[in-house]
Structures are given as C-alpha cells and as structure tokens.
From Swiss-Prot:
Changing residue 302 to A: Cannot complement a cysPUWA-tsuA deletion mutant. Changing residue 84 to A: Cannot complement a cysPUWA-tsuA deletion mutant. This is Thiosulfate transporter TsuA. The chain crosses the membrane at residues 1-21, 45-65, 71-91, 103-123, 149-169, 198-218, 248-268, 290-310, 318-338. One of its GO terms (biological process) is thiosulfate transport. It is found in: Cell inner membrane. It is a multi-pass membrane protein.
Amino acid sequence: MFSMILSGLICGALLGFVMQRGRFCLTGGFRDMYIVKNNRMFYALLIAISVQSVGVFALIQAGLLTYEAGAFPWLGTVIGGYIFGLGIVLAGGCATGTWYRAGEGLIGSWIALFTYMVMSAVMRSPHASGLNQTLQHYSTEHNSIAETFNLSVWPLVAVLLVITLWVVMKELKKPKLKVATLPPRRTGIAHILFEKRWHPFVTAVLIGLIALLAWPLSEATGRMFGLGITSPTANILQFLVAGDMKYINWGVFLVLGIFVGSFIAAKASREFRVRAADAQTTLRSGLGGVLMGFGASIAGGCSIGNGLVMTAMMTWQGWIGLVFMILGVWTASWLVYVRPQRKARLATAAAN
C-alpha cells in the first residue's frame, strides 16, 4: 500500500507540476485550432503521444508490460467524445486541466471538478447500468488498429513519428514572435523551474515521459493501464460515500498528486491565487463538469485516457475519440465565443 501511495503521488505530482508550469491546456489548444487557426498545442499533443507510444511498445516487446486493447465500443466513443468536448469548453479545462487549475486556486475549476466527480461516480453506479449496457452492444471486435489490419504495431508508430516530426519541424521554422517579459527575479535552476516560460514542445516531451513512467508504476500495483483521470476521480467520491477500500487504487493517488504538484508549482512561481467565480462562470463550470463526467464515462476515457494514452496504444477508441472530442470543442467554441462576438459586431455595425 505504501509503495502504491508513494508512486501514485509522485507520478501525479510530476504531471501536475509540468502541466501547470508548461500551461499545457488541451482545451485551449483545440479551441485555438478553430478560432485562431493555431495548431501548436495539437502538435505538442502528438509529441507526447509519440514519446509514450515508442516507449510503451518497446516495454511490451521486451516483455516488461502487458496490454490488451479489447473491443471497440464505437457508439459510446463517438457520442461520449463529442459531449466531453462540449463540456471542457464550458468548464474551462479538460479533466487534468481542471485538477491542476483547482491547484492554482480557481474556484470555477473547483466547481467543475466537483460536478465532474459526481457525474463520473453516477455513471459507474447501478443507475446508469442500462445505458452502459446498451452502448456496449455497439462494439466491434478489435480496438487495436494493428489487429484490425493484421499488422505489426511498429509501422503505425513509424507513421505517427514521421507525421509528428514533419509538423513539428514545420512549426519550428515559422518566425518567432517576441513576447514581452519582465526582468528575471531568479537565476539558475530556480529561474528555469519557476519563472522561465516553458516551450510547449519541451513540456510535451516531459508529459510523454511521465505517461510512459505511469505504465510500470501502475502495473506494479495490479492496475493494468497508464495515466487515467475519470475513473480515479469517481473512485474518490465512491470511497468517501461507501467507505469501501476497493475504490482506493494507484489512479486515486495519481489524481491527488496532480493537485499537489500543481499547487507546489503555482505557489513557487507566484501564480497561486484564490479567484472567485461570478454567477455565469459558476453555472457554466458546473454544467461543464457534468458533461465532462458523462462524456468521458461513456467514451471510456477523457483527454488523457483517450486523447493521450489510447492514441499512443494505437487504438480506434483513442483516435476516433480524439477526433470527436475536438469536434465537440469546436462546436462549443462557436456557441460560447464565435457566435456572441459575431452578434456583437453586427449590433455595432447596425448602430453605426
């Protein structure tokens, strides 16, 4: 038990620290792809996926890890991924983003985290068993893309690496925009860790390595998976309500560690502030959390479980879930940002 607690907390704290300092926000990244046509954060996600994919399949080939992709619940993945995408825009962050922003002191993220936790737990209760069983009927035999085409997984990993290297090199060749910065207050390692602006691609490499580390640490405790946010988040509430130790696992300490790591990073970099939410933000965050919990539960994963881990494992669930997650973000971005701005411009033009 002690080793499970320690390894889960350390892995989570590393992830929370890196995501907070690197401002690694997939919600903002997917939104920017649509609104400002900026794909940098998506390319960063591809880097993290690639690093993890190469590492995990190397460990599997060496006989150090085991993994079965199972069946592909396509209907739940499509519907859930889209709903989750809608929810993360309203909540102001994805599942992991909500955890690390709660560690920064954002009350809106606390609200989103609570409703996300409640809905995730509800979706694992007998009340949702009928819906879950119905969605499970709409599945295909193979979740693994390689198994579907009777291929080795390595050609797929190679294609991912080539695409990732190409888009990253293309992005790095673009002219750099100068960003105004304040004079540094710190020097050396303290400046790098707590003050210097982190490049998203460097952050992505670190996240990929942490995601890789999560596999052996998690499997050592009997949990045969890597990073995962939704189920452990639900497990916290299930344990608090039922008091049953069966809900305590490595993933629970992972998500608690994300909060701790983010808090440490925010305090050390002087970015921690308790920021209250107005009525509109409160309602939007609460609704966003509900949609996140519902969507991630029926999709079988969130932006980390499907978007980072299952994509790295070369599964249909990961890549198709990611596509519909992005489509959900774009739809919500149009409703929340683009449409109101367009209406405001038209009203201004009419007034003039």
